Amino acid sequence: MILYPAIDLVGGKAVRLYKGDYAQMTVYSDDPVSVAKEFQKAGAKRMHLVDLEAAKSGIPANADTIRAIAENTDLFLEVGGGIRNMEILETYLSLGVDRAILGTAAVTDPQFLKEAVEKHGDKVAVGVDLKDGFVAIKGWTETSNLTAEAFFEKMQALGVKTVICTDISRDGAMKGTNRELYKALSEKFSIDLIASGGVSSIDDIAALKEMGLHGAIIGKAYYTGAIDLKEALEVAR
């Protein structure tokens, strides 16, 4: 199983939100490039980046930081946040990003998603935020009437290869992952499923690996010291 340590970006800084609430933000580092280098030093091969400002506004606000991480590490970078048209998607790819994650747009603009997958293939992934089994959109502020299962069916039909699945009732709350949900989705669909949100212990990582999940994202648990990245990478391997 592949581990993706994560950096959420606001104003060029590495931050974390509590349960997706922009008012409850903790700044962990003023230098995200050095954080990314620490990931690499610990043995990580990939990382997950989210431009939280772009997730809200649709305008890439941390492009310089993302480019600097791409230029100063050998990590495979996946980036999400506000990718709502081809121009923004291709801007991210031009910064040296290996995979761009479509979130809100995958729900609200299926035509764009279809074109993006046709043009860029597996350089395009989809990030879905789930709240109580339904898809949430617009930086977690709205819930749609689309169930997780119906959403995955659509993605599979469109040829999406990778879906990052976040249970936002658990994200950043250190409550442990929603194992039942991930297990059901990974058994039913042939999509590479990356679990995100609430991965708070080595036990979580071991359990997700046992389910045969493609990957898992580690956020807050790394920054608080609840998970040692080196150990986590060993367990996932």
For each feature predicted by the language model, list its residue ranges:
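Glycine-rich phosphate-binding active-site loops on the catalytic face of alpha/beta enzymes
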Residues: 94-112, 198-201, 211-229
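Conserved anion-binding
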Residues: 19-23, 98-171
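Glycine/small-residue-rich loop that forms an oxyanion/phosphate-binding "nest" at active or ligand-binding sites
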Residues: 53, 61-117
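Conserved beta-strand positions in the central sheet of alpha/beta enzyme cores
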Residues: 48-51, 78, 101-102, 125, ...
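Catalytic cores of alpha/beta
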Residues: 73, 77-96, 180-215
